[in-house]
Amino acid sequence: MTEQTNQNPAAAAAQTGPIVNPQAVYIKDCSFEAPNGPFVANTTGNPTVNLNIATRTAPLTQDVHEVVLQVNLEAKAGDKVVWLLELQQAGAFFIRGLAGNDLTHVVNIVAPNYLMGFARATVADLVVQGGFPPFLLPLVTFEALHARAQQQQAAAAAPASTVN
């Protein structure tokens, strides 16, 4: 036996609330370089790894937004580059029922957090396939990155003070 409900469409739509669903996760661009292979001369210990992470977003349609997590890594032993990795881990997210700060929160914080696990696995796999021990991306606080970006935008938009 099935249960029947007599709800009008407007009431049903009101109950669904905001919707956020990943539609696709993909590598938009990727590059791994090991200029000297895994046998870098005169290296002892672990290399120093410089990490830069950035995000960017763009609407693809009215309800679908692309979020790109850009990860750049450079491993160096002294002045020698051991390996370089550039990754653009992207996702298309269906987002409906959100606007303003809520939409900004999803595309700048929630979506990059979702993509980070995929990026972490890709980075570890590429480094291992390059002949090196795996590198695990650290936890990233996208809330702090977003807050810093907003502060920088506000500072750039503020009028410069003049001294007479």
Where do the protein language model's features map onto the residues?
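N-terminal intrinsically disordered, cationic/polar leader segments
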Residues: 2-114, 118-164
